[in-house]
Amino acid sequence: EFRRQGHLMIDFLADYYRKVENYPVRSQVSPGYLREILPESAPYNPESLETILQDVQTKIIPGITHWQSPNFFAYFPSSGSTAGFLGEMLSTGFNVVGFNWMVSPAATELENVVTDWFGKMLQLPKSFLFSGGGGGVLQGTTCEAILCTLVAARDKNLRQHGMDNIGKLVVYCSDQTHSALQKAAKIAGIDPKNFRAIETSKSSNFKLCPKRLESAILYDLQNGLIPLYLCATVGTTSSTTVDPLPALTEVAKKYKLWVHVDAAYAGSACICPEFRQYLDGVENADSFSLNAHKWFLTTLDCCCLWVRDPSALIKSLSTYPEFLKNNASETNKVVDYKDWQIMLSRRFRALKLWFVLRSYGVGQLREFIRGHVGMAKYFEGLVGMDNRFEVVAPRLFSMVCFRIKPSAMIGKNDEDEVNEINRKLLESVNDS
């Protein structure tokens, strides 16, 4: 019966992908639609898979925004692949809970291996790899990765300055940094007044300025505060700009800040030699993360985090109650990933990434990235040939930022009016 139902499910998904281009990309339903058409209570008696899938087709799919549609261009991609789906299926089927090495050695050791593989593809410094004293871990999202490293940085600093100084710790980023950092800072107990989102400008292509960073640090030091943590970005959400890592890390190290590099979207591109330059300076960072579920054909969720000093994470995140004690952990020769993350339980994420790496290989993965960049470059050229539009930020990867030119709007010279016209264009595209 399991085999029969499995075939039904694969056929259902295959049919969905065959037709996905025909669905409206954005769901057309109204808020609360589903509660109105589903029963008020769960069924008392079992229902067949056929009946359930029929409801998926008629009630669930109309409420889905189809992220895998070829017509979906919003946000960063959530790329999937056959290899990713199958790896996820196997992981779910095994249903192991790999919180430490003993409960599923293969889950832990495969994660060790694939994060080292991926790190080598990115030409990360050896100090970020298990083979060089560092190591990688697969988290759910960048939010988790940033929170874990921020907590590690916080505790390392407070062990030196005293726990009562948590209110003096300061976190730095640009006004283009992902909001994940702000959320992590709140959870980690950083005083909201000590969160520095340093202003960027169009003249610098919205990069974080090292001089402004140093000025902010000096100002805080003069006021008795303790600079703690810098988050630099490779591929910002708004424009995919790249912060100048070499100069920023030089400033940060001068004042003993923990440096995290968030490359959630654009990091995957750096497996291509022509994009690796954007990671120059990462050798001076303390941690680095990217989301394989964004641009690396790996299904959600799969955030890869590398750290130079795993002991900093472990000191902050480890717990060792009686029921978790075992001989393998006590040897200190194995990795217990529960001590590298927020949760205790964890999924076998490494399987799907392993499937992707093996099914496509480095060569095809590079061509996949280059294909997307090539399409973006082509679109950028089309925008450039139309005098009604302008590209407003340099295209570095596969995202193009453009708008209607103010000069194309008769009598519309006020910036607010220009923005409103462009907002209406955006809304009309999304409604189409």
Swiss-Prot record:
Pfam family, one: Pyridoxal_deC
Residues bearing the modification N6-(pyridoxal phosphate)lysine: K294
Family named by the database record: Belongs to the group II decarboxylase family.
Catalyzed reactions: L-tyrosine + H(+) = tyramine + CO2
Keyword annotations of the record: Decarboxylase, Lyase, Pyridoxal phosphate
Subunit architecture: Homodimer.
Gene: TYRDC-1
Entries under SUPFAM superfamilies matching the protein: PLP-dependent transferases
PROSITE patterns: DDC_GAD_HDC_YDC
GO molecular function, one term: pyridoxal phosphate binding
GO cellular component: cytoplasm
Ranges annotated as spanning the membrane: none
Record-level GO BP terms: amino acid metabolic process; carboxylic acid metabolic process
Organism, scientific name: Petroselinum crispum (Parsley)
Family matches, as InterPro entries: Aromatic_deC, PyrdxlP-dep_de-COase, PyrdxlP-dep_Trfase, PyrdxlP-dep_Trfase_major, PyrdxlP-dep_Trfase_small, Pyridoxal-P_BS
The protein's name in its UniProt record: Tyrosine decarboxylase 1
Cofactor: pyridoxal 5'-phosphate
EC class: lyase
